[in-house]
UniProtKB/Swiss-Prot annotation:
<feature type="compositionally biased region" description="Polar residues">
    <location>
        <begin position="134"/>
        <end position="148"/>
    </location>
</feature>
<dbReference type="GO" id="GO:0045666">
    <property type="term" value="P:positive regulation of neuron differentiation"/>
</dbReference>
<keyword id="KW-0804">Transcription</keyword>
<keyword id="KW-0678">Repressor</keyword>
<keyword id="KW-0524">Neurogenesis</keyword>
<dbReference type="GO" id="GO:0007399">
    <property type="term" value="P:nervous system development"/>
</dbReference>
<dbReference type="GO" id="GO:0003677">
    <property type="term" value="F:DNA binding"/>
</dbReference>
<keyword id="KW-0805">Transcription regulation</keyword>
<comment type="subunit">
    <text>Interacts (via BEN domain) with RBPJ.</text>
</comment>
<feature type="region of interest" description="Disordered">
    <location>
        <begin position="1"/>
        <end position="65"/>
    </location>
</feature>
<keyword id="KW-0175">Coiled coil</keyword>
<dbReference type="InterPro" id="IPR018379">
    <property type="entry name" value="BEN_domain"/>
</dbReference>
<protein>
    <recommendedName>
        <fullName>BEN domain-containing protein 6</fullName>
    </recommendedName>
</protein>
<feature type="coiled-coil region">
    <location>
        <begin position="62"/>
        <end position="99"/>
    </location>
</feature>
<feature type="compositionally biased region" description="Basic and acidic residues">
    <location>
        <begin position="162"/>
        <end position="172"/>
    </location>
</feature>
<dbReference type="GO" id="GO:0045746">
    <property type="term" value="P:negative regulation of Notch signaling pathway"/>
</dbReference>
<feature type="compositionally biased region" description="Polar residues">
    <location>
        <begin position="1"/>
        <end position="15"/>
    </location>
</feature>
Length: 279
């Protein structure tokens, strides 16, 4: 009787183990199917390839490509990189313009108010207006942003300023920025000064100003041009000597004067052509 009971217990134990093993296998199978379904429903999760990427099964391995095919692939990638950089640059310029636009509108409104005040009561142009006038023709959005930010600090100043106050304000305001230096050709001092002055001033300003304000013996113009702000001249000299230590002040001044003379000759040439047409 005892043997029969032991035999029944062994049989029950084996049956229980078989049932437990079967349930475990069933659960593992269900989990595997669930993971497979999840991978099909969400192809971009886990180790799935991102959009725009292709798996090694879809794309032929580089080792199997010929030399011509590799060159064509490299050329295509270079073109994509160039286009991406151009688009990135365009978007950055657009972003700068969007950031500057509200401030630019405010500055122009102030200029209109200043012009109306000058027409009604007379007086001298404020530093803010003169600074904007000199940088109006600069096409760089960064240049206009810098001009607006510099002139914004003086937006609350009165329309009419004394010459001494205006001169002191210009001296405090003028500073050559790093981005302005970065835009210039640094191969030779004359090329650097030409590019730097083109960034800092408009052609109209350079054509109507001289280095010292004194009349040159070789100049054909009867009128004496006003001198540039000497603080600005010293700033240009200092920046130039940092890049070209062997260049002295006299040479740099001569180069600045040469740039001013070149801008002066252009309007005269067009005036002579117009006079010939009239004759």
């Amino acid at each position: 009787m005892q043997k029969i009971v032991q035999t029944d217990e062994i049989t029950n134990t084996q049956a229980f183990r078989k049932g437990k093993r079967k349930r475990t296998e069933t659960m593992d199978s269900e989990n595997a199917n669930s993971d497979m379904d999840k991978g099909q429903r969400d192809p971009y999760s886990g180790n799935a390839f991102l959009p725009g990427e292709s798996s090694s099964e879809d794309e032929e391995p580089l080792a199997e490509l010929s030399k011509e095919e590799l060159c064509a692939k490299i050329k295509s990638l270079k073109e994509k990189l160039t286009n991406t950089r151009k688009e990135n640059s365009r978007l950055r310029q657009s972003l700068v313009m969007l950031q500057v636009l509200p401030q630019a509108v405010t500055q122009f409104e102030e200029l209109v108010g200043m012009a109306e005040a000058l027409l009604k009561g007379g007086g001298t142009m404020s530093t803010s207006a003169s600074t904007l006038w000199r940088a109006t023709n600069n096409s760089s959005p960064d240049s206009f942003a810098s001009t607006c930010s510099n002139s914004n600090s003086n937006s609350s100043s009165p329309v009419s300023l004394k010459p001494e106050e205006e001169h002191q304000t210009d001296e405090k305001q003028f500073q050559i920025e790093k981005w302005q230096i970065a835009r210039c050709n640094k191969s030779k001092p004359q090329k650097f000064i030409n590019d730097l002055m083109q960034v800092l001033y408009t052609n109209e300003y350079m054509a109507t100003h001289s280095l010292t304000g004194a009349k040159s013996s070789t100049s054909r113009d009867k009128a004496v041009k006003p001198a540039m702000n000497q603080n600005e001249v010293q700033e240009i000299i200092g920046v130039t000597k940092q890049l070209f230590p062997n260049t002295d002040d006299v040479s740099i001044r001569r180069m600045i004067g040469q740039k001013l003379n070149n801008c002066t000759k252009k309007p005269n040439l067009s005036k002579n052509l117009n006079s010939q047409d009239i004759k």
